[in-house]
């Protein structure tokens, strides 16, 4: 894969320990020193996420806690300590990774109800959420259809509809 693999998405990384991911990353970097790994950690407790960004295990993880908070802040129209919590998490991960951690921000993904449905069709709330996560530091990921306000609630077939290219 040396000439072809630059990015790898690693779902549900919590089923392996951080030492395993550190070894995996080292092996990937032997093939391509510029490899970009993104880990999916469904973990609301940021203290339990630290080992995955520590000592070079992963430098990028999807931040599910942040995604939930962004949606909540936008929908409720109240900060509720969000900014101070965010700064605390960024400091914690930055320290643990020797400044190499980059957050991977998103609002929803292929396993979740779509943003516009979560916002109950409120376009202003959806735009507020988008404005927040698109201006945060790190790497932004947009689930297809979010940019045009697609709606959809679980089950999966309702959130994985084809993109309406001609509407």
Give names to the regions the model predicted.
Residues 1-167:
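Active-site and adjacent substrate-binding regions of carbohydrate-active enzymes
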